[in-house]
Regions:
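Hydrophobic alpha-helical transmembrane segments in multi-pass membrane proteins
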Residues: 11-28, 54-83, 105-128
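Membrane-interface elements of multi-pass transporters and channels
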Residues: 37-41, 72, 76-87, 139
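Membrane-interfacial helical/loop segments at transmembrane boundaries in membrane proteins
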Residues: 81-101
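Membrane-proximal intrinsically disordered regions of secretory-pathway and membrane-system proteins
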Residues: 1-6, 89-90, 106-111
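Membrane-interface extramembranous regions at the lipid-water interface
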Residues: 1-57, 130-151
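Membrane-helix boundary connector in multi-pass membrane proteins
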Residues: 101-108, 133
Length: 151
C-alpha cells in the first residue's frame, strides 16, 4: 500500500511533464528532478518516474521520425514546382500556379505524417492526465506505445 506522499510524488511526476507547454524541455527536466529525488525512497515513485520518462523519450523519437518524413517531402513538393532559373534571373518572380499532380503521393504521405504528429500530441496530453488520475488512486500506470529506454 502506497502512502499519500508516494501517491502525490508519483502524480506530480506525471503532471510535471505538462510543463513542456511553459518551459522548453520541461517535460524532461521536471520529471527527472522529481523522480531522482524520490526513486530511492519509494518503488512506486520509481516505477512511475520511469514510465513518464520512457513515454516522453518515446514521443520524442516518434516526433523526430515524423518530422524527418514530413519536412523533406514538403520541401521536395514545393521546390519541384519552382523554376530556379526564373528566380535567379528575374527580380519580379511570382509563383502563379502550383502543380501538385506529379507529387500527390508524396504530399499525401507528408500530410499523414503531420496528422499523426498532431494525434500524438493530443493523445499525449490526455494520457498524462489519465496517468495522473490513476496514479493518485495508487494504481501503477503503464503508457501505451512506450519504448522502455530506462528499465
Amino acid at each position: 500500500m502506497e502512502t499519500i506522499t508516494e501517491k502525490n510524488a508519483a502524480t506530480f511526476t506525471h503532471l510535471s511533464s505538462l510543463t513542456q507547454y511553459f518551459f522548453p524541455f520541461g517535460n524532461y527536466i521536471f520529471p527527472i528532478l522529481i523522480w531522482t529525488s524520490k526513486k530511492d525512497k519509494s518503488e512506486f515513485v520509481d516505477h512511475n518516474g520511469k514510465q513518464v520518462l520512457n513515454f516522453q523519450l518515446s514521443l520524442l523519437l516518434y516526433s523526430l521520425v515524423l518530422i524527418a518524413i514530413a519536412i523533406p517531402i514538403f520541401i521536395i513538393t514545393i521546390f519541384s514546382n519552382i523554376p530556379f532559373n526564373a528566380i535567379i534571373h528575374d527580380d519580379n518572380f511570382v509563383i502563379n500556379n502550383f502543380n501538385f499532380d506529379n507529387n500527390m503521393g508524396l504530399l499525401t504521405i507528408g500530410i499523414i505524417a503531420v496528422l499523426i504528429f498532431g494525434l500524438l500530441k493530443v493523445s499525449e496530453f490526455f494520457l498524462i492526465i489519465y496517468a495522473a488520475i490513476k496514479t493518485s488512486n495508487g494504481e501503477r500506470f503503464k503508457y501505451p506505445i512506450t519504448i522502455p529506454f530506462i528499465k
